[in-house]
């Protein structure tokens, strides 16, 4: 916690505004939207809810196709199923680990030949690094398909000076407990489409029509953020830049420590932007004698948590029957599978002390001796 969260939460209690509306909800929506440079936003129960509402806002219905990054967490694509849509997974590129414009173009051409188009493209900004949005936007504009930018992991990151999450028709952020700022649970949908956000607020409060009695002409959802949770978010937003600076320091410390180990490659930091360094990830060379599981188990033995990189959606048991477009059809495995096979997420908590990080580094270095 940054310190001011208690002030905003106390205000909610003192004024007896603890429902999913109030000064903190309004304030959090306004302050975060202004921070990222978007016209408006809707504070919601989760990032997943935000993706769901974005899909509904762009008109996804039963049977509609939605292109989505494969190398991501399941919350990026589960809402497609909620609306009866059909996900089509898109591979990554090595340069950013994010959606491959090459694979995206392949998917569009294939669907053009079929005589149909996806209803939307969900672009995920993995581990705080923005996708190459100029290339992706150019492709999506060519086929007149809206972008939903999943910036759950990349709040505060920029692409060519513009904030991650503000490039599509809608952008989403997550404030889950593990994100760069947290409300314990929550999300935000941002857009320059003020009418669309107003509709999302309506759907998210059970789609109650304006009437003296309870009247409903549309299906609604219990997706709005509470005034208490929003108060935590307002306090957290005030320390976001400090968090990003600390995350970058953690990344740079790992980078310096591992620079002599040829088999360790740090996560990409693309010249086109600045990530928020949410998680520091590494990939090991194909010929490395040390494998990702060796690192995970060695740290686990010392009660230190690390994790594999996200398992791509197109090889997940639930989603393996859905279509997938690869970056390079000539390779035996996709780029996203390759990153998964060779990748590790290292401890990156902003509360981690220098001594604790040095302990992590010492354990990993010891495996390569």
Residue ranges: model-predicted function:
Residues 1-18, 347:
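N-terminal "arm"/small-domain region of PLP-dependent enzymes with the aminotransferase-like
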Residues 18-65, 79-81, 89, 113, ...:
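Phosphate-binding glycine-rich loop
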Residues 23-30, 35-39, 102-106, 110-116, ...:
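PLP-dependent aminotransferase class I/II
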Residues 42, 67, 88, 146-148, ...:
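Structural detector of well-ordered beta-strand residues that form the stable sheet scaffold
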Residues 47, 84, 150, 179, ...:
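Conserved G/P- and acidic residue-centered "switch" motifs that form tight phosphate/ATP-binding loops
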Residues 149-183, 212-217:
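Conserved active-site segment immediately N-terminal to the catalytic lysine
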